């Protein structure tokens, strides 16, 4: 099977959740395992499609959980957070993924906010993601997670983040 056919077969097997087909197609071939597509790595695709069993398999096989890819040049964590797959978010964090806040587009918290996934937001906050970092870019200016949630009409998430920001300030005041 030629490379493009193999890649398409793997991508389709991941989308359908066919773990045995994925295992057979990748086998022990490290080159195929570490293929980067226009959609990102196989881990990005599995995270986007909510395929937990395949995510676990790929991580076990050795795909870097911090690999950058997809249209935002972001991690699979950002993809899973944006889709609302809290179990995959939890697994990737347990597997050592970094909470990348280097840009708004890479920030998994902003992806979860945009998607309206409060449970993912809460988990990321519990794991210590920086909720006060501010970004200025294409359509945002000095915007932190709270303002981003308000901007996109995620009122319940915005209220939660405001409480967390206030708690953070109170802890700092008590510490001083």
Model-derived features: positions:
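N-terminal segments that cap or nucleate solenoid repeat domains
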Residues: 2-45
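Conserved ankyrin/ankyrin-like repeat signature
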Residues: 21, 53-54, 87-88, 119-120, ...
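Ankyrin-repeat boundary/"N-cap" motif
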Residues: 4-10, 35-42, 68-75, 102-108, ...
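Alpha-helical adaptor scaffolds
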Residues: 68-90
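Ankyrin repeat domain, specifically the short helix-to-loop turn at the C-terminus of the second helix
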Residues: 24-31, 56-64, 90-98, 123-130, ...
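Ankyrin-repeat-protein effector appendages
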Residues: 1-9, 95, 127, 141-176
